[in-house]
UniProtKB/Swiss-Prot annotation:
Biological process per Gene Ontology, one example term: reticulophagy
Pfam families per record: UFC1 (PF08694)
Keyword match Cytoplasm: no
Protein name (record): Ubiquitin-fold modifier-conjugating enzyme 1
Active site: 116
GO molecular function, one term: UFM1 conjugating enzyme activity
Lineage: Eukaryota, Metazoa, Placozoa, Uniplacotomia, Trichoplacea
Domain of life of the organism encoding this protein: Eukaryota
Organism encoding this protein: Trichoplax adhaerens (Trichoplax reptans)
Family: Belongs to the ubiquitin-conjugating enzyme family. UFC1 subfamily.
Physiological role: E2-like enzyme which forms an intermediate with UFM1 via a thioester linkage.
Keyword Kinase part of the UniProt annotation: no
Database matches in CDD domains: UBCc_UFC1
Length: 168
């Protein structure tokens, strides 16, 4: 079941057409352009809705992505480094998004801080190859993961807001 807000968000993210990964040289350049258009549109939409929650950039080849993501809980902003590599089998395989500083702090995470998307997101990705891209991974993967995990980690005292730790 997908709620209406998720449907609206998803509908506003451009779908991709090119089935190409990093090993596909010229086709990868085309796919990367589609990825950037989709990401830019998603970020623009988020800003319009006052829902800006991540920044991403990539290496020159578009195979390694990194940046920051954040989640606001109880009016406090929790910010994390985010990183992922584009798999060689992309877009057939979704990227494994990692939040390295949360490594080992929740059961819904694999070694290296890779967030668990196996049960919900990966089957959805598989049904939508090659239409889904990085923006979709952020919107349907990392975003919902943060919304579930960060409040839980805060309530359990596993993560503490930076201002609280510096004032103690």
């Amino acid at each position: 079941m997908v709620d209406e807000a998720t449907k609206r968000t998803l509908a506003a993210i451009p779908l991709l057409k090119t089935r190409a990964g990093p090993r596909d040289k010229d086709q990868w350049v085309g796919r990367l352009k589609e990825e950037l258009v989709s990401l830019i549109k998603y970020v623009e939409n988020n800003k319009k809705q006052d829902n800006d929650w991540f920044r991403l950039e990539s290496n020159k080849e578009g195979t390694r992505w990194f940046g920051k993501c954040w989640y606001v809980h109880n009016l406090l902003k929790y910010e994390f480094d985010v990183e992922f590599d584009i798999p060689v089998t992309y877009p057939g395989t979704a990227p494994e998004i990692a939040l390295p500083e949360l490594d080992g702090k929740t059961a819904k995470m694999y070694r290296g801080g890779k967030i668990c998307l196996t049960d919900h997101f990966k089957p959805l990705w598989a049904r939508n190859v090659p239409k889904f891209g990085i923006a979709h991974a952020m919107a349907l993967g990392l975003g919902p993961w943060l919304a579930v995990e960060i409040p839980d980690l805060v309530e359990k005292g596993i993560i503490v807001h930076k201002e609280k730790t510096s004032s103690e």
